[in-house]
Amino acid sequence: ENVVKVSFRKLKYIHHISDIQIRNLKRHREYEEVFERTYNEIKKYKDNSVVYIGGDIAHSKTDMSPELVDQLSRLFKNLADIVPTIIITGNHDCNLNNLNRLDCLTPIVKNLNHPNLHYLKNTGIYKCADVQFVVWDVWDKDKDYIKAKDVGGDTKIVLYHGTVDQSRTDLGFKLPSKVKL
């Protein structure tokens, strides 16, 4: 069984962050200001909570500057210092055309070695307190995704970086996808 270790039994809050798409060199000061505000907001609701970063954390796939590595490292550490932090891969965090290449998040997470930082890289079921997180990995095909009916527990949340069929943009445009609800 895959377990996201937390110190509480019932999950109350999920602070959801996604598609940050931090650039190699641009707007880093602006990102830092926004991250500081984010840390302060999370601290207000940190009891029985986790941060979930839903992919596309970096922008440039596997092309990374030292500045980007530094900013990602600080972001992950600062969040994990506040609450358990769960991350998944987005299509901008890896090279989907070359599965032999390492994604850009793995070396950072591995080197931080933070007990509160959880990188859920693979499709699977991950128990976190009273919740079953079902991860659908960006490298997998939709036929390999685990269905909710096949997962035990009362609360099941799919962690997925991609389009779900019939999603709509803020302008009402429908986004097609093979992934159905």
Write out the residue ranges for each language-model feature.
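N-terminal active-site segment of His-dependent metallophosphoesterases
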Residues: 1-75, 151-152
